[in-house]
Each structure stands twice: as structure tokens, then as C-alpha cells.
Amino acid sequence: MEYTVGESGLDAAEFIAFACRIWPADYDLQRTRAALSRTINLTAREGGALVGCLRILTDGCFFGTITELLVLPEYRRRGIGSALLRLAREHTPTMLYFGAQPGLEGFYERNGCRPSLSSYVIEPRR
């Protein structure tokens, strides 16, 4: 497994194809490209193929948030998510916040994360 911190050249089309295998959606290529350019991208690759990704949005000083931690289903339970979290902790100067999907709290706690703020969402008006 090859891990990269700060993969600024992460291809938007590749990321969309990867993300759709986990969270199927109609992702916009240009918006995805813009989003990837604004985050610290940590990747896990096997044979050059993207199999895991953790993205961090940060001001570089006070606050950072993990926007997502994604690992392809067939690569889960191999330590990839744990390795990406460890790299995030080692390469981010800020405290990291994130929301966890229900049922995954144990994974995060085993990886040294602790419960913090309650999460809320403001949905865009349609």
C-alpha cells in the first residue's frame, strides 16, 4: 500500500469514480476539482489505484475538519482507514473535528479519537 500526504494533483474524475463506489451521487466535475484543490488530500493506493482517501479542510492555524474518510468496501478492515487517520494526525498542525456515521464510533475511538462537539447540519434551500 502506498500512502501520500498532500496529493494536490488528485484527479477529480478519478476521485468521483472512487467516491461513487462508496457514496453514489451525481458529482459535478468542476466543483469536485475546486474542492480537491482546497483540501489536504491523503491517499492510499494499491498498484496505482485509489483505494482510500481522507480530506482535510483547514485554516492551518486554529481549526481543521476531516471532510471525509473513504475506503473502498473491498479494502476495509485492512488498516487503511487507521493509517490515513494516523497520517492526518501527524501532518496537520490543528485539532481535527469531524462527524462520524452512526455505528462507526468504535472505529474512531480505537484510533485515539474522542467524542467532542455535537454535529448539526444546515441544508441548502432548494
Predicted regions and their residues:
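Conserved beta-hairpin
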Residues: 34, 39-54
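A conserved beta-turn-beta hairpin within the catalytic core of GNAT-like acetyltransferases
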Residues: 56-66, 76
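Conserved GNAT acetyl-CoA-binding A-motif
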Residues: 85, 90-103
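Conserved catalytic-core motifs of GNAT/GCN5-like acyltransferases
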Residues: 95-99, 109, 114-126
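Conserved acetyl-CoA-binding loop-helix of GNAT-fold acetyltransferases
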Residues: 71, 77-90
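Short amphipathic alpha-helix that is part of the acyltransferase structural core
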Residues: 1-29, 119, 126
